């Protein structure tokens, strides 16, 4: 890294081949236009070729008519020669150690970026920047190598550095395309696996910390931080059937049950230093497991490259690189492909709200606040000590737009769950008065971030109609999951954080007190159809001292398991798509630890295994019963039978599908008391079969049931002309369906 000052002045024999000031600037790594000096240049009577090879004692030009020794133009390793005509050539360098190497001259190749690309990049409207910027393996004029292109408009010099040039920034300085602030170079002879960074000199002459590639497809395994050249290229995907049905599978009328996964801690290999599974190992083990449990999708905590494992991926540096902790980009593609083949969709958490201040990342990228706001009242997130993207800059939002499309196109992911949307929407998010700047209307809305989110959603759904976007938005911001043309933000779904907090609080209460908190289970129906909601029991609820979901259930061990089963029964029969964090499907008892495997040994306990059986059956019921998913996000899909029996802590409700005669009756008894002869009204006469009972012995319960089902009686009740008398088991949710 860096450069030598060398001795000033030209070698006598080269005085006519290069100006002294140019030679000195090249040798010091301070020339602003290296392509104007290096490589071939037509002059009167022929061509002057110049190359900087500080590792070389002698350099020869190899042309069709033989080889010609170059003159040393500067003692630090600048060589030059004048040849007749304009021959095609290569270089042969004799190193100081006596070894030799043949190489193509990077400075004889044409520009990397076409004029249209430069125009679109300057506008900030190039939606496929990932195909042009970063490191792209190419063949140019019959020569294999790598195109490098980088946005750094305020830099005075940018170079590609790596093992291939001794990390010497003088070796491969790049060409500046002034109209777009893009630096570019084609380096022949490089290929997949080359390790590199960018050496950037700020406009004031400061040498900045080496930077990883913002568009890098791959990176070294942390704690190393360099980028790695990786050619994604074309893949023979085997998920054509899935992709053809993607739109139907992600539709709001479809069953969507999501298993949330942290790749590094789902399962580990204790025999091999307790390492996490690789992408390829996960492809089979996770795929089979999730398919067996009946989840329709997995959601991965952020898989973007990130330096700090304890951030769980929520502080990414390499947005275009799946983390190398578990394998290569192609192996992550294999994971997605295999999951699709097993009928499982893939959602990734997408972090577009902030980025960390690691010196090799986007922070102060070209010596200026390029990606972030300069004013800390706009550009610094105090809670996380991270930096906030400048959504008002077209090149920055173009970077994020392209990244969203990149994961959908290059990795076939089915959806993006956008993290921390509330922090993006509000200028005063987690800030005291005086710590934020109002918008142009004097309000606290981040108008630029709102425009970004709307545009991002419109692009995703226009380019990939079968995909989905999901917002983690924790406030009452209206119309998050409504179309942009109607004034919404354009997301497909929104996490229902209010439902999660209310229901967790209720089921964490001792049953004797639940009558006083009855509204915690009913309140969500007042706003349940304002958005397309996902009901989340996510990783956020099993960290930071909160314990596990099971650990928050009250009572003795039997009651805790019963409460958890009843809660899951309630969740799966309420309107909204489902999300459950890994480990909670078998009643993990300890808080989640990102450095350890889930407690799989608990499955040796029949009670934990019973909870897993329940999740499997709930997913099956949810998928196969249209009444449980077709109208998840519409008022017509739900009706209370009785929501007022707070004294007994009993709730009864109907779920409905498109077919008005296809409905389910659900009854929840959330006290440890058996409720015999409990009468509820039903809309139609007939035999009501008990489809599911969370108190079944199959799930670890006491097996108090209704003998398979009950007949209606012509006793009007709850506003219906018929009713059924049930035996409600303690701390349980039961589901009934009329036989037709």
Swiss-Prot record:
Question: What Gene3D superfamilies would the database entry show?
Answer: Glycosidases, Golgi alpha-mannosidase II, Immunoglobulins
Would you name any one GO CC term? cytosol
What would be an example GO MF term here?
A: 1,4-alpha-glucan branching enzyme activity
Q: Which UniProt keywords apply?
A: Carbohydrate metabolism, Glycogen biosynthesis, Glycogen metabolism, Glycosyltransferase, Transferase
Tagged with keyword Glycosyltransferase: yes
Q: What is its EC number?
A: 2.4.1.18
Catalytic residues as annotated in Swiss-Prot or TrEMBL: 419 (nucleophile), 472 (proton donor)
Task: Note whether Transferase occurs among the keywords.
Answer: yes
Gene Ontology biological-process annotations: glycogen biosynthetic process
Q: In which pathway does it act?
A: Glycan biosynthesis; glycogen biosynthesis
Listed under catalytic activity are: Transfers a segment of a (1->4)-alpha-D-glucan chain to a primary hydroxy group in a similar glucan chain
Q: How does it assemble?
A: Monomer.
Q: What does this protein do?
A: Catalyzes the formation of the alpha-1,6-glucosidic linkages in glycogen by scission of a 1,4-alpha-linked oligosaccharide from growing alpha-1,4-glucan chains and the subsequent attachment of the oligosaccharide to the alpha-1,6 position.
Tell me which HAMAP family the record gives: GlgB
Among NCBIfam families, the record links this protein to: branching_enzym (TIGR01515), PRK05402.1 (NF003811), PRK12313.1 (NF008967)
Give the family from UniProt.
Belongs to the glycosyl hydrolase 13 family. GlgB subfamily.
Q: Which PANTHER family match?
A: 1,4-ALPHA-GLUCAN-BRANCHING ENZYME
The name of this protein is 1,4-alpha-glucan branching enzyme GlgB
Which organism was this protein described from?
Answer: Paramagnetospirillum magneticum (strain ATCC 700264 / AMB-1) (Magnetospirillum magneticum)
């Amino acid at each position: 890294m860096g450069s030598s000052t060398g001795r000033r002045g030209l070698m006598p024999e080269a005085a006519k081949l290069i100006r002294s000031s140019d030679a000195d600037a090249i040798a010091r790594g301070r020339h602003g236009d290296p392509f104007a000096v290096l490589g071939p240049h037509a002059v009167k009577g022929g061509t002057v070729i110049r190359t900087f090879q500080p590792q070389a004692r002698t350099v020869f030009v190899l042309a069709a008519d033989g080889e010609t020794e170059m003159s040393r133009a500067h003692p630090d390793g600048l060589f030059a020669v004048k040849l007749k005509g304009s021959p095609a050539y290569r270089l042969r360098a004799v190193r100081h150690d006596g070894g030799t190497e043949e190489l193509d001259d990077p400075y004889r190749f044409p520009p990397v970026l076409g004029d249209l690309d430069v125009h679109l990049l300057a506008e900030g409207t190039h939606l496929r920047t990932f195909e042009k910027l970063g490191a792209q393996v190419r063949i140019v004029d019959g020569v294999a190598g790598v195109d490098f292109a980088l946005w750094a408009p305020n830099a005075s010099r940018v170079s590609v550095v790596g093992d291939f040039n001794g990390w010497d920034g003088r070796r491969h300085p790049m060409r500046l395309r002034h109209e777009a602030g893009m630096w570019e170079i084609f380096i022949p002879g490089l290929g997949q696996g080359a390790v590199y960074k960018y050496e950037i000199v700020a406009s004031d002459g400061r040498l900045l910390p080496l930077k990883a590639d913002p568009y890098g497809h791959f990176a070294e395994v942390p704690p190393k931080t360099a980028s790695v050249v990786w050619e994604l290229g074309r893949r023979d995907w085997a998920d054509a059937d899935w992709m053809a049905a993607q739109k139907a599978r992600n539709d709001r009328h479809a069953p969507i049950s999501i298993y949330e996964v942290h790749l590094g801690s789902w399962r580990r290999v204790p025999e091999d230093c307790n390492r996490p599974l690789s992408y390829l190992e996960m492809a089979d083990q996770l795929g089979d497991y999730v398919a067996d449990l009946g989840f329709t999708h997995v959601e991965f905590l952020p898989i973007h490259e990130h330096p700090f494992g304890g951030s769980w991926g929520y502080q990414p540096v390499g947005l275009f690189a799946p983390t190398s902790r578990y394998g290569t980009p192609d192996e992550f593609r294999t994971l997605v492909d295999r999951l699709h083949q097993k009928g499982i969709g893939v959602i990734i958490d997408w972090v577009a709200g902030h980025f960390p201040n690691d010196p090799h990342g986007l922070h102060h990228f070209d010596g200026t606040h390029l990606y972030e706001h300069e004013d800390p009242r706009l550009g610094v997130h105090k809670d996380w000590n991270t930096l906030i993207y400048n959504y008002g800059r077209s090149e920055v939002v173009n970077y994020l737009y392209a990244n969203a499309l990149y994961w959908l196109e290059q990795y076939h992911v089915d959806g993006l769950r956008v993290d921390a949307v509330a922090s993006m929407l509000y200028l005063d998010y987690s800030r005291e008065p005086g710590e934020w700047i109002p918008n142009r209307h004097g309000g606290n809305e981040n108008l630029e971030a709102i425009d970004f989110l709307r545009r991002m959603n419109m692009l995703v759904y226009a380019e990939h109609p079968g995909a989905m976007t999901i917002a983690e938005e924790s406030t009452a911001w209206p119309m998050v999951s409504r179309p942009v043309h109607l004034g919404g933000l354009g997301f497909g779904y929104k996490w229902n954080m209010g439902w999660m907090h209310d229901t967790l609080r209720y089921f964490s209460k001792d049953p004797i007190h639940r009558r006083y908190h009855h509204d915690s289970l009913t309140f969500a129906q007042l706003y349940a159809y304002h958005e397309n909601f996902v009901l989340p029991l996510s990783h956020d609820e099993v960290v930071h001292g909160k314990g596990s979901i099971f650990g928050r259930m009250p009572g003795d061990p039997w009651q805790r398991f019963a409460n958890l089963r009843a809660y899951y029964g309630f969740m799966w029969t309420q309107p909204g798509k489902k999300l459950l964090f890994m480990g909670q499907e078998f009643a993990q008892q300890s808080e989640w630890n990102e450095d350890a495997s889930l407690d799989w040994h608990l499955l040796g306990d029949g009670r934990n295994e019973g909870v897993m059986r329940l999740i499997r059956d709930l997913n099956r019921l949810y998928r196969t019963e249209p009444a449980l998913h077709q109208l998840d996000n519409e008022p017509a899909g739900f009706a209370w039978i009785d929501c007022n029996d707070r004294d007994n802590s009993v709730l009864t409700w109907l779920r409905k599908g498109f077919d008005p005669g296809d409905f389910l009756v659900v009854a929840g008894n959330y006290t440890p008391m058996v409720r015999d002869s409990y009468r509820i009204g039903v809309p139609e006469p007939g035999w009501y079969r008990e489809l599911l009972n969370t108190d079944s012995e199959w799930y670890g319960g006491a097996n108090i049931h209704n003998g398979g089902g009950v007949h209606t009686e012509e006793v009007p009740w709850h506003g219906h002309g018929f009713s059924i008398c049930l035996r409600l088991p303690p701390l349980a949710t039961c589901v009934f369906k009329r036989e037709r």
